Amino acid sequence: MSPRRLLPLLSTPHKGGRSAMTCQFRCGNQCAHDVANTSGNPYFGEVAEQALSRRGVLRAGALGALVAGAGVTMGAAPAMADPGRSGPPRGKGGLGFEPVAPNKADALTVPKGYRSSAVVRWGDPVLPGAPAFDFDNQTAEAQAMQFGYNCDYVTLFEMNRNRGLLWVNHEYTDENLMFRGYTDGTAATEEQIKIAMAAHGGSVVEVERVRNTGEWKLVTNGRRRYNRRITVSTPMRFSGPAAGSDLLKTAADPKGVKPVGMLNNCAGGTTPWGTVLTAEENFNQYFVNGDKVPEAQKPYITRYSIPSGTAGRRFDRIEERFDLEKHPNEVNRFGWIVEIDPFDPDSTPIKRTALGRFAHEAATTTISRDGRLVAYMGDDSRFEYVYKFVSKGRYIKGHDRHNRTLLDEGTLYVARFTGDSPKEELDGSGRLPSDGAFDGSGEWIPLVSGDRSFVEGMTAAEVLVYTRAAADKVSATKMDRPEDMERNPVTGGVYIALTNNSNRTPAQVDEANPRAANKHGHVVELIEQRDDAAAKKFSWSVPLVCGDPNDPSTYFAGFDKTKVSPISCPDNLAFDPDGNLWISTDGNALGTNDGLFVMPVKGKERGYVRQFLTVPVAAETCGPLISDDQLSVWVAVQHPGEADGATPDRPASRWPDGEGSQPRPSVAVVWHERGKKIGA
């Protein structure tokens, strides 16, 4: 049999568009290491390939025949949405802006008629009394009172129409851009390491609207009594079934209930009672001597990609708890969903163990038909899984004391995806199967509920602390870096951003496992049975297969590809009140800047992807938030100027402050210059 043509994004091994510097500081070069998931569980590529093969040539020839020799145009510039075409007529919830063209500008580029500004930047004072930022005279004491480094998840709690509290994650630090002459953690000064530790975590800052428009600015005077910094050194507590487990006990915390700090917080979510859920992601890279833990722990150290030896930022030089030879359980105290009350600056952040431990990307909540709280979560690593938590108790509006117990008791599930086409119809000819469908089904497999484990050979505490290993045992489906998961407020569908997976090589391709080097990523649409978030079964489809629209194998839900924008590496997701899907990208493998895109998911414009903005050189677009009044679009501009070879003496970006300045990760807001709603 001749080899089958690979799906979109998938032709050659590639690490995407990230710089080597980003890979080093953000995730500890995960792509350079062995894949942590060596289980024999099914890979979503196999499942999706079956569904795609069933369709063969999708609507308007979107994917093309899956046969050898159907080459992809690589030399041509990526296609872009044609601003000269009107596209489909606007309906309710339609969007009418002129798409931003792909570019490499050192600027936040927005559509004609829109404006943007940086609301809060790395080093801006957060706490009253904090000094003004001085790049060449940084101190750890000052940084602990200032806005942290690489901002990610953003959410706004409105106090009234014109004032609000902005929560922002600070995912990681890039010391090469923060300090002149930096080489590595071993040679760094202790003060530099302390500054980096203080630059992690999160911030609560008060913001105010400007002149009744969609523009917002940082409040810089007055009490600002809610402003707060959370860092690696902030006291926290565990709650839920694993709290107090032997797996969480250390010399400094013999009861296993008082963790300290949070690390590598990526995306997140909010609760109906007004708190933040922030997700600890690539926590593994902060520890040393992973090879020197007790033998019984080593399989789990490997499963979570904890490094051996001493390298990286060397937090262990300041606090020895990061040395696993001395404190082997300390690593188990990271990788959780952390709940924080932005309206109580004296409250203790809570690590919710019932939601499991892995490289959490997000925690999107909703209420099921019978009133239970549901949280959707992705594990952002190659070949990892997607999860759902369903509370035992029911949400009662206005009863916050009761509601704050919901995340402590419930059932944690992992997803298994299945294709539904008979094998005899999968001949690779491009002929439609008898059902003519491009979809599949799936189920949520229970892992643990309270103190009851559903995984053979593992206690409830082990399932929660070593969740990846538990999911391996129940044949969960391996995914291509499952990142954000968001539920559509209009349709109820759940959307999963699968960023990419460079590690499926051509040597691994066969008839049952035919996809390699997922270079540009895709988006999965999941519909819960009976539209009930607590359901145990679902259907799924792939409405967006990312890449250059000139590539005949990309797919935009059947929409005319001459009108769409190229998109690569979907990361964070958001919805506007009309139910349009907003997609931010990370590591654009098409050679241009990352951006924010919007795609209707229903009606005639389903699949009509348009680029709304691009971020500056070498930056990532994070934390998109579309305000309820649709007057503002918020984005976190992470790691501007994080290009290979860049240093403070040779910066690759000057954003946001311009000539003569250093690049500063910042949260920006975009609004229509005439006060219209976004997309008007």
Residue ranges of predicted features:
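Beta-propeller fold recognition
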Residues: 190-196, 200, 213-228, 384-470, ...
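Blade-edge beta-strand/turn elements of extracellular beta-propeller
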Residues: 105-121, 129-142, 213-224, 228-256, ...
